[in-house]
Amino acid sequence: SRINVEKFNEMIEYEKKKIKSYKEDAAIYLGYKLQSKYYIKKNYPNDIHLAVPYNIIINKDNVTSVLLEKLDMLPDKFVIKKNKLSGYTVIVDKNEKISYQEQKYKYSTGNLYEILTTMLRYDYDKNPEEQETDKMDLFLEEYVPVKEEFKFHCIHGRVIMIEHSLLNTGLSN
């Protein structure tokens, strides 16, 4: 089935208006992946399946302790994402490799630490004109094997392009 982009944008605008009634800046709220996941899970529990986020948040203040204390408790495969921005996804397979930015690295705690500290080095999404900074966090979620992927490219909360990729062939449109 085809996705009606105009209808999708209407739904997003409608949800932003609903959120504004109790949250001052809906655009910011919907810009955070983890908060968006909780919102979708709460409002569309039977319509949309999402990867389950683990209750682990990583930032540059706790990256070492998380790796030392939590890594052994995680399943063999899991995903790490930035809570904001796109394109920062790490797929960890503790039996084999770490995939990050289309590169494969041998799995080791040291390699994972290097990747995470690189991601967190640029952990502030800020306007240089403003004093406030918005700290960037990483979150962990379950690994869900998929054969195809949809990416919604948005500018100012509006979908401008939908990218569809077949992961087993590398084809996209």
Predicted regions: what is each one?
Residues 1:
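S-adenosyl-L-methionine
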Residues 4-97, 102-127:
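A conserved helix-loop-beta module that forms one wall/lid of the active-site cleft
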Residues 97-173:
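Phosphate-binding site of ATP-dependent enzymes
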